[in-house]
Amino acid sequence: GIISADQDYYNKAFKQFSKVKSLQNKHSQFNTEFLRTLVFLDKFNEAFSFSQEVWNEEELFFEADLLLGLKYFMERDHINAEKHFKRLNEISYYNPFFRDFIGNVLMAWNEASINNEEESFKYLEKIPKPYDRIIKIQSSFIQCYFNDDKTLLAFQQLLQDKEYNFSRYNFFLINYLLYENKNYEAKNIIKYARGEYSSNLLLKETEFFLLNKKMNKIKSFFNCKKNEDSLAEFFYILANLYSSEKDYKLSNFYLKISLFLNKKF
């Protein structure tokens, strides 16, 4: 089963894992590979169920805590979501990131979902400095979620950072402006952005919709008032990080979660 998963033959791997499912709770690598295979195949309901079967409070299981936390988060069970998200801050074999990164991002959104704006930003402040650009992105989205007066400025400051290619976030600024009924300003942004990033396909598509007055099409892709949409973008970023490191298996894992949270984008 594990060999097939490594070769990305996910359907074959799923069948083989299912035959030897008795290994669960005895073989941690089996649990990890089977859970990832379920995600690769978009079998999220089965992934949630399997996570509940193998979860153990005494043992850190990164993927299981991540999926269970997301399950409870989407069900608006924020107490149980918090329990699992906080465990993601611990360094373990299954947590490839520094302590206090993924868990704090998810906790920030968990607090935002219960309208606790102050606590939401406190969790962002706990994220390690190496991820300061991700902090800026999440901060912009949370400000947008709470309709903060500084949302526009936050997006503008993000785009002014020339040390990193934030061209994608012109779309989110335009999206925000359209929700604020500032169509003229949105058109000015896309005109400038297309001049700067002529090969960006997302911006090219956005320009097409704007020129053809299909503003609702742009708004249908993303809504910062829907926390699942913003979390989907976070997991999209993680997928890109792993892709840049040529770890395509983990990249696909996070990309699948991103698409599960927001199938429209």
Q: What role is predicted for each listed range?
A:
Residues G1-Q16, S230-I257, L261:
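Alpha-helical segment of the N-proximal tetratricopeptide repeat
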Residues I3, T37, K71, N110-E111, ...:
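Residue-level signature for tetratricopeptide repeat
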Residues A5-E46:
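N-terminal, post-signal-peptide region of Sec/Tat-exported proteins
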Residues Q7, L41, E75, I114-N115, ...:
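Structural motif corresponding to the intra-repeat A-B loop/turn of tetratricopeptide repeats
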Residues F14-S18, F44-E57, I79-S92, N116-K129, ...:
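Alpha-helical repeat scaffolds
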Residues Q24-N31, E58-L67, Y94-L106, P128-S139, ...:
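Generic helix N-cap/helix-start motif at coil->alpha-helix transitions
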Residues Q29-E75:
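Mid-chain, structured segments of secreted extracytoplasmic proteins
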Residues L203-K217:
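Short, structured interface segments
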